[in-house]
């Protein structure tokens, strides 16, 4: 069963990647030459730095793939973290066609396979810069070394980062590359976790309000077949730090996704990486969650999201709102309808409707410690006032707190 599941995951990623063959223009080739010079220069500046298993910065030291990832990042080229994953990208280069800036790959001595365990940056004339356990970052002529020439398995040329797609969600996500990972974080100022990044980006780019957790987002999105993936879709992964849906990233095109990585920060990663390939579960699209702003009640209600705090007894944006005060104010302002002041009376002010018949602008009630009214805006979402967040949007079908507190709905006309 596990073998079948893993095979399905492999096919899922393979279908996505097979469409992605980059073609370079003359201008991009010129830019690539400049990038190679920068990468080689950066690598030479790191000569003498110590070896460190898992190291990827000058401060801590470098392992082989950490060094390669670091010097390429200085040219704004984002590489996977492991040797094996770096070997999967770029263009294969024959030994006679090597240029400075190419990456050389080596297998374990005595191995009969072609799995790379070490990589290095080619700098010309048979020489390479790499990080070794015995001497740290050094220059070695691999052609004159029986060890390195005997374990050489190939080279890759990675001239430039593939361009991220020119769609609002991807362009917005790209702004936050480098922002630290913070568990529970959902803004650039505090940092992001994976679902916090997805939620924030969709709100900023498209005005789409997603649930907070990855598993809740997965539940409300539109399922997308791998062959139909497009930039701006969200890719979900399972069994990372917990069982089930547990991680998400925004597909950026060219087989890459932007994510808040628990081990790094907001970064660009490749779906072809062994780790992500084994964890990938599926794809979701959220175009269907666009708020129907043409509805005057919905339009008015969403004006105050994130702008107005909770205030006991509050009935205006200037003072803040309590739960019923918010609903009363929106209906009066948007539709000229005078509702009673308190939730119990509001519940009796309209026509009772079934949950399945809800339309944007209807009033939905939840029973917590008291009766809480909210305004339905479509797609299972409501605008309401909470003590902690003020005016906010909640998906009433996936919220762990509100989904079991549904008490009824009315339509006021």
From Swiss-Prot:
Limits of the NlpC/P60 domain: 33-159, 163-287, 291-413
Enzyme class: hydrolase
Effect of residue 224 to I: In strain: IFO 16449
UniProt source species: Bacillus subtilis (strain 168)
EC identifiers of the protein: 3.4.19.-
Protein name: Gamma-DL-glutamyl hydrolase
Record-level GO cellular component terms: extracellular region
Subcellular location: Secreted; Secreted, Cell wall
Primary residence: secreted
Signal peptide stretch: 1-32
SUPFAM superfamilies: Cysteine proteinases (SSF54001)
């Amino acid at each position: 069963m596990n073998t079948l599941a893993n095979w399905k995951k492999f096919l899922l990623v393979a279908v996505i990647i097979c469409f992605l063959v980059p073609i370079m223009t003359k201008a991009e080739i010129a830019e690539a030459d400049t990038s190679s010079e920068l990468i080689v220069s950066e690598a030479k500046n790191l000569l003498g730095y110590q070896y460190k298993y898992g190291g990827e910065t000058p401060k801590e030291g470098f392992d082989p793939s950490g060094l390669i990832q670091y010097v390429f990042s200085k040219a704004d080229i984002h590489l996977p973290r492991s040797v094996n994953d770096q070997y999967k990208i770029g263009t294969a280069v024959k030994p006679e066609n090597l240029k400075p800036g190419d990456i050389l790959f080596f297998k374990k001595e005595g191995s009969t396979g072609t799995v790379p365990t070490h990589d290095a940056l080619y700098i010309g004339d048979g020489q390479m810069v790499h990080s070794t356990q015995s001497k740290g970052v050094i220059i070695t002529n691999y052609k004159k070394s029986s060890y390195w020439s005997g374990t050489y398995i190939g080279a890759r040329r990675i001239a430039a980062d593939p361009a991220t797609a020119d769609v609002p969600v991807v362009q917005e996500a790209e702004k936050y590359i480098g922002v630290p990972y913070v568990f529970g974080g959902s803004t650039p100022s505090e940092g992001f976790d994976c679902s916090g990044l997805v939620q924030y980006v969709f709100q900023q780019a498209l005005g789409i309000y997603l649930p907070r957790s990855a598993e809740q987002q997965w539940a409300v999105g539109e399922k997308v077949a791998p062959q139909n993936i497009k930039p701006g879709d969200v890719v979900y992964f399972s069994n990372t730090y917990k069982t089930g849906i547990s991680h998400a990233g925004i597909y950026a095109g060219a087989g890459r996704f932007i994510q808040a990585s628990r081990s790094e920060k907001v970064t660009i990663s490749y779906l072809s990486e062994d780790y992500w390939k084994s964890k990938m579960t599926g794809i979701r699209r959220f175009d269907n969650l666009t708020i129907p702003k043409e509805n005057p009640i919905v339009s008015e209600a969403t004006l105050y999201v994130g702008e107005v705090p909770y205030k006991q007894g509050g009935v205006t944006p200037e003072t803040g709102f309590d739960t019923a005060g918010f609903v009363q104010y929106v209906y009066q302002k948007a539709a000229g309808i005078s509702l009673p002041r308190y939730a119990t009376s509001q519940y009796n002010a309209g026509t009772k409707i079934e949950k399945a018949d809800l339309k944007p602008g209807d009033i939905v009630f939840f029973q917590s410690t008291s009766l809480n009214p909210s305004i339905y805006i479509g797609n299972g979402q409501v605008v309401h006032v909470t003590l902690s967040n003020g005016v906010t949007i909640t998906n009433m079908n996936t919220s762990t707190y509100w989904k079991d507190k549904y008490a009824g709905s009315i339509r006021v006309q």
